[in-house]
């Protein structure tokens, strides 16, 4: 899922500017529509995960998310691309929350730090390697090839969900619908800290390839190679440090 998504993140701005002639301000609107869709769904995702069977919900959201990649083949204006990204962002929010919850459920509690470290590693690897693959595909075959490859990868990801041995959960009463189910006040400081880190990172990842082409860097993909090396090293070390009490969270 993440690999498919991050293939579009650095290459879509280049496609919009070079092939559709869209201004950089409009590019920002297109990119932000995805985040807006995600934010509209995220507050309700936890409630849905608690109310319904998690694995079927995960498969449903993942399937819609994957199929929406095909929408980019037909979206040729700013507003149609924004619409596809908005809807896909919403299903990305539901897919990520249900996937994270399932991951926590299946990891043994004694190895949760290490397990989540490896889970996070796969996400970070996708963030680092998918743009590298996408840049190579874009230079050789164009943006529509990226869409096709991303769609296939996402569909393979759906198939791999069947390999997850998810324990049966006892039926519990559905939680009452209330505002505090969607906003966890205690989590706001951590959310703010992550937001302050994610904003500059998202800006960098979205426009680094476009900037590299503007200053005529021969291969902007090297940026992602070095980032992948650092991410893998940090993730492999940090999970074990948390489990052994060396890092307190």
Task: For every predicted segment, state its role.
Residues 1-20, 25-28, 199-211, 223:
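Helix-loop boundary and gating motifs at the non-cytosolic
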Residues 21, 53, 74-79, 246:
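Helix-breaking motifs and short loop linkers at transmembrane-helix boundaries and internal kinks
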Residues 35-43, 127-128, 231-232, 236:
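Residue-level signature of mid-helix packing/kink "hotspots" within the transmembrane helices
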Residues 40-76:
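Conserved MFS/SLC helix-loop-helix module at the cytosolic interface between two early adjacent transmembrane helices
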Residues 79-85, 190:
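Short hydrophobic/alpha-helical segments at membrane-entry points of transmembrane helices
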Residues 84-121:
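Cytoplasmic helix-loop-helix junction between adjacent transmembrane helices
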Residues 151-170:
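C-terminal membrane-cytosol helix-exit motif in multi-pass small-molecule transporters
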Residues 164-194:
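Juxtamembrane intracellular "pre-TM" segments in multi-pass secondary transporters
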């Amino acid at each position: 899922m993440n690999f498919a998504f991050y293939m579009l993140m650095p290459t879509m701005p280049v496609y919009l500017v070079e092939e559709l002639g869209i201004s950089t301000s409009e590019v920002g609107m297109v990119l932000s529509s995805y985040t807006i869709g995600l934010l509209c769904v995220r507050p309700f995702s936890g409630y849905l995960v608690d109310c319904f069977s998690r694995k079927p919900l995960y498969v449903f959201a993942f399937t819609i998310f994957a199929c929406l990649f095909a929408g980019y083949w037909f979206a040729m204006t700013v507003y149609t691309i924004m619409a596809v990204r908005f809807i896909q962002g919403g299903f990305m929010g539901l897919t990520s929350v249900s996937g994270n919850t399932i991951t926590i459920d299946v990891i043994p509690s004694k190895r949760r730090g290490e397990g989540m470290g490896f889970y996070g590693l796969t996400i970070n690897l996708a963030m680092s390697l998918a743009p590298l693959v996408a840049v190579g595909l874009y230079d050789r075959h164009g943006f529509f090839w990226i869409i096709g490859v991303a769609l296939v990868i996402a569909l393979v990801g759906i198939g791999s969900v069947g390999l997850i041995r998810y324990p049966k959960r006892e039926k519990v009463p559905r939680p009452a619908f209330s505002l505090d189910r969607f906003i966890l006040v205690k989590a706001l400081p951590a959310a703010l800290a992550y937001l302050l880190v994610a904003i500059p990172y998202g800006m960098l990842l979205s426009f680094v390839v476009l900037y590299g082409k503007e200053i005529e860097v021969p291969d902007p993909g090297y940026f992602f190679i070095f980032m992948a090396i650092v991410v893998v090293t940090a993730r492999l070390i940090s999970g074990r440090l948390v489990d052994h009490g060396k890092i307190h969270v």
